[in-house]
Amino acid sequence: VFLKSVLYNEIRNFCLGKAEPTTNTKKSLFDPEAVFVTDLTDRNEIFKTVSQKLYDLGYVKEDFLGDIIEREDKYPTGISMRPLSRELPDVAVPHTEGDYVSAQLIVPIALRNSATFNNMVNPSEALEVKFLFLILNNDPDMHSTILAKIMDFLAGTSVDDLNELFNSDSNEEIYDFLENNFEIEK
């Protein structure tokens, strides 16, 4: 009853212009329903499985799967983590054009077994990737910002914390860690 009263008064005062809301208005780039942990090891099978779920959630359009496979073939997104630490597995940041998505979201995908992606910097180099940050972005002006935020997160998070994240088997733990540690605004 007390909490209902406090909430009621907060809403009432806000509507009357007497107070600011105290709720968290932080924009999230993550959705707990769009976090994946998989045993799949084939890149295209991973994309197929995740794409179907994202389509069911309304985040991607029908042609998303074909475009993400084609784009990954032409413009690889693997990132070697060796410059940060030899202890870390490699990651990838696959993405498509905004025409194929309906949201702005980062979809974390933990791989129990590695999958081969080519290096973004050196496309002829194959990397054994264990974690994906799949970028969904329907705002073309935000693409480089989201990618920069991912790079800042990787560079600014301890090796131990990244290892724990990359090797997690729990969708909830992955979501909670990213939601609490990924900085959206600076």
Residue spans of the language-model regions?
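Cytosolic covalent-transfer regions centered on His/Cys nucleophiles
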Residues: 1-186
